[in-house]
Amino acid sequence: MKINVYTLNSFAKTKEGGNPAGVVMNADSLSEEEMRKIAAVLGFSETAFVLQSNKADVKVRFFTPDEEVDLCGHATIAAFYAMSSLNLLKQGKYEQETRAGILGIEIHNDNFVMMDQSMPVFSEVIDKDEIADSLNISTSQITSDLLVQVVSTGLRDIMVPVRSMEMLDAIRPDMKKVKEISRKYNAVGYHVFSLESLHGANAYCRNFAPSYGIPEESATGTSSGALGCYLYHYGKINEEQASHIIFEQGYSMKKPSEIRVSLAIRENRIIEVKVGGKAMNLTAAEVEI
C-alpha cells in the first residue's frame, strides 16, 4: 500500500533547523494501525494526519512512531503550513479538532502559523534532587529561585530551569530515569531551559521525551506554550513582553529552531495562549506500508 506524504521542518530558524514532521492529507480512509505504521516508516517524532471534521474546519490526529498523542505543536504547524502552501487553505482563522479539544489556528500572510493552546494548568512541584539525578547534574545547577513543576497548555511537561546555557548544553540525561519520572508524573517529558540565550530570545531550551520514543526533540510547540505561561507566572516575563516571547531550541542538535509564544493578559491573568512559527523544506514523498 503506497501513501502520499509531505515532509517539512517546523519552527526552522535555518534550512538545517526546525523539527521534521510528516503530513498526510485526506487520511479518512486510513485505519489507526495504518497511521501508526506510516509514522513509524517516516520515523519523525510526530506525523500529522488530516481528516474531515463535523466539529471544526479539519480534524488532525498525531502519531509518534510508537503511539497516538493528543496534540503536537510542531506537527500542527507543519500540517497548516502545508495546507496553506498547497493552496488548500488561505490566510485567516481556522479551527482544528484534536484529541485535546478544538483549537484555533491562524495562518498569516507569509504562511506563518499560530495555534491556540489550552489555558495553563500548574500541577505538581517536583523535588529538584530527583530531577537532577535523572539529568546527571548536581542540584545546584538547577536555578534556585524557580520551581521544577509540571505545567500544561494541552500536554503535561516538567519545566526544569538550569542556571546557564553552558550547563544546559552539557546535560547528558539518563534516559531510563527520565522515562520513569515522566511516567510517574504522567508527563510527556522534560522541558529544560536557561534564561540565557544565543540571539536575545527569552530562553534557550532542550526537550527530552523518551517515554514517547523521543530522546531529544529540536522544537517543541506545546512545551513552549507551557514555558511561556510558567515564566509569566513566576515573574520572569512581564505583561509587555508576554505578547512576543521567543524561545531557542535545537541548537545542541545542530537544528536551530525558533518558537514564538504570545500570551494575552487581563488583570494579571493569562486569558489566551498562542504558539507558532514557520516551516521550511516542504517536500512530497511516497511511503509503502
Language model features with spans:
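Active-site proximal loop and beta-alpha junction motif in alpha/beta enzyme cores
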Residues: M1-L71, I77-I289
